[in-house]
Design a protein with these regions (language model features):
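Mixed-charge, Lys/Arg-rich low-complexity intrinsically disordered regions
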Residues: 294-322
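Extended, Lys/Arg-enriched charged tracts that mediate electrostatic binding to polyanionic substrates
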Residues: 171, 176-237
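A recognition module on extended beta-rich or small alphabeta surfaces enriched in W/G with H and D/E
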Residues: 230-300
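Short secondary-structure junctions and interdomain/linker hinges
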Residues: 86, 90, 157, 161-165, ...
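Short alpha-helical "patches" and their helix-cap loops
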Residues: 231-244, 249, 356-360, 394-399, ...
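Basic, alpha-helical terminal appendages of large translation-related enzymes
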Residues: 403-430
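Short, hydrophobic/amphipathic alpha-helical patches that form generic packing surfaces
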Residues: 80-85, 152, 156, 212-226, ...
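The feature captures two recurrent sequence modes
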Residues: 1-191, 314-409
Length: 430
């Protein structure tokens, strides 16, 4: 479905307030490995194939309009230029930033994008903010002006809402859990301890604060919202748009679809470590904007304060036991990265059919060095299938993938990857 995206009036030239600047970092694009790009490509092929029929109608046009493609991790500077046509900018940030800062960025029409990339082990979902979620999840629907109006309004409210020490402790617990889960070498005991700490912080929440109300409304809409018909809704929430596995659950009886209601939303807590048991279906984005104004009146918080880029709301200091530079490093062997890069180079073309088959044969011999790596086998198999070479080796790789389907989650990942090999629908976002 082709939509005509509406461009914003005038360029985005307002300066970023000084108190938000420390959260902005340079995207370390050269640090992304061929494995990182392969993870991006796997997830995006799945996303586009599924959301073609299940996401908000602007999704595919929104991907293109926001400067996002399938084959490689996007450059945030490219996204920034693309989004400026729709009244937005994009900046790179270092993982979790304080909730008030996260909200104020968006209230000012600035999409903060974490630069981290999820690992192969967490390809289906990661609790840590990463570039898949924050670019391919958040950016596409921002090309809809009515959604933009809603996001800026709720985030302006969130930037001014009062938080409690319990809210701040919960933020730190969520951040710690995401770091532990994405850090190679974390022990089950460390993960368990972080999960227990999160549960303790959740249990310590007494009365629902202003910030918690807005956070819940944001979660059930911007992150996990559905729109349209209750029996056949469309997805617009970033958490769903960046996770096909959870999106597929939406259309089963495992997830209750509930008509959107402001009071129900702000009184319904959420758990970032589990699938959502229910989701809210709004009639339109205008309905959501109206709800934000109702909540703002109820909390006696004026809207419109952040339109002047020189005004600001104080941001609480970031308190953490880890430094901003102490981010997880994925310990991929150099030879494995080189093998992924060789496959990436072949996909780019520029070699003869004879040379391509010779390289695929050489890479096939290397697969045995990585007996547990299912993604590189899918990458190899896709190329061999596309160019109709080495049929016996293809059969052996398929058998190896079958043997690697040792858990329900792994089985689903491999099956989803195999389903797209030799098919065209996910090849582009057009």
């Amino acid at each position: 479905m082709s939509l005509r995206l509406k461009k914003a009036e005038g360029p985005m030239t307002e300066p970023i307030p000084a108190h938000l600047s420390p959260f902005i970092v340079e995207q370390p694009y050269g640090s992304y490995t061929a494995i990182d790009h392969a993870v991006w490509r796997y997830v995006m092929r799945q996303n586009v194939a599924f959301h073609r029929d299940h996401a908000h109608a602007i999704y595919l046009e929104g991907l293109k309009g926001s400067g996002i493609g399938i084959e490689e991790i996007p450059r945030i500077e490219t996204m920034n230029e693309a989004l400026s046509r729709f009244g937005w900018r994009a900046v790179a940030v270092d993982g979790f930033i304080p909730p008030a800062a996260f909200m104020e960025f968006q209230a000012r029409g600035i999409l903060p994008i974490a630069c981290d990339m999820r690992s192969v082990e967490h390809v289906a979902y990661t609790p840590a903010p990463d570039i898949i979620h924050e670019s391919a999840g958040h950016a596409p629907i921002l090309c809809d002006p009515s959604f933009t109006a809603f996001v800026k309004t709720i985030c302006e409210l969130g930037a001014q809402a009062l938080s409690t020490p319990e809210d701040d402790a919960l933020y730190e617990a969520i951040r710690l859990l995401s770091i532990v889960k994405e850090t190679p070498g974390s022990t089950p005991e460390e993960v368990y301890a972080a999960e227990e700490r999160l549960k303790e912080c959740q249990a310590a929440i007494g009365s629902v604060s202003e910030a918690n109300m807005v956070s819940r409304l944001y979660w059930w809409t911007v992150e996990y919202g559905l729109i349209g018909d209750l029996d056949n809704p469309r997805i617009y929430g970033a958490g769903l748009l960046s996770s096909v596995g959870e999106s597929q659950r939406v259309f089963t009886d495992a997830v209750a679809k509930v008509p959107f209601d402001l009071d129900t939303c702000i009184m319904t807590s959420y758990d970032i470590t589990s699938y959502q048991p229910q989701l809210f279906v709004c009639e339109s984005f205008e309905q959501l904007t109206d709800a934000v104004h109702v909540l703002a009146d109820r909390l006696d918080i004026p809207l419109g304060r952040l339109k002047n880029a020189t005004e600001s709301v104080p941001i609480p200091p970031r308190v953490s036991s880890r430094s901003a530079q102490d981010t997880p490093e994925k310990a991929y062997p150099a030879e494995l990265i080189a093998a992924y890069q060789a496959l990436r180079d072949l996909r780019a073309g520029g070699v003869s059919s004879t040379e391509r088959e010779a390289r695929l044969a050489s890479l096939y011999e290397e697969l045995g060095r990585y007996p547990e790596d299912w993604l590189i086998r899918l990458e190899w198999l896709e190329l061999a299938t596309q160019h109709q070479v080495m049929p016996e080796a293809q059969a052996e790789v398929r058998e190896a993938l079958s043997r690697l389907s040792t858990t329900p989650d792994r089985r689903e990942l491999i099956a989803n990857g195999l389903a797209l090999i030799g098919t065209a629908p996910a090849a582009s976002v057009s």
